[in-house]
Design a protein with these regions (language model features):
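Bacterial Sec-dependent N-terminal signal peptides
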Residues: 1-26
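C-terminal and inter-domain tail/linker signature
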Residues: 21-181
Length: 181
């Protein structure tokens, strides 16, 4: 009886240990990458920081709009701050960073290790409410936004942004009309 109990205990222990050996993905909120993403959303545009934040070969998707390269995205970002909006804030900001193991499944059933050559795939997720005042229209804008940042070697190499662009597009159109006069 005693040997049977020992065998059962060892079997359960081994099963639990092997269960824990699979995927090792984890999530953080106070890590260095999450804190950099938080800093990115500071009310004033810190160009030296943003320049270091993004990799040169950055790819950005804003809804279905694709922007290739850090230089091109930084031009757009600077226009948002300098030409389109003032008093920009990201209210109710939440940021967390996902550290995916190579065994983590992707949307098509492959593993992260099969899709990416990196040892670990890192995505930070951020969401909150973008607020600001249109520089041309004077209208207060407020819309929810979700953004994802893929980091490699300490720099963001891919960014995804999802939001309803109606208010931003209205301010861009107002800016274009004034500029054409």
């Amino acid at each position: 009886m005693k040997s049977r109990l020992i065998i059962i205990t060892i079997t359960i222990f081994c099963a639990l240990m092997s269960f824990g050996q699979g995927e090792k993905s984890f999530l953080r909120t106070k890590d260095e990458i999450s804190m950099k993403v938080r800093k990115y959303f500071a009310p004033s545009l810190d160009l030296p920081f943003v320049n270091e934040f993004y990799a040169k070969d950055l790819t950005v998707f804003i809804n279905d709009l694709k922007i290739e390269g850090k230089e091109n995205y930084l031009k757009r970002l600077q226009m948002i701050h300098d030409d389109f909006f003032k008093d920009i804030k990201m209210e109710n900001l939440h940021v967390h960073t996902n550290y995916f193991s190579p065994e983590a499944l992707t949307g098509d059933g492959k593993t992260m290790g099969e899709v990416n050559s990196e040892k670990q795939t890192i995505w930070s997720n951020a969401w909150g409410t973008f607020t600001g005042i249109g520089r041309v229209s004077g209208k207060k804008v407020s819309f929810r936004m979700h953004m994802d940042f893929r980091t490699k070697n300490g720099k963001v190499i891919e960014m995804l942004a999802y939001y309803d662009p109606a208010q931003m597009n209205a301010e861009i159109e107002a800016f274009k009309k004034v500029r054409l006069k």
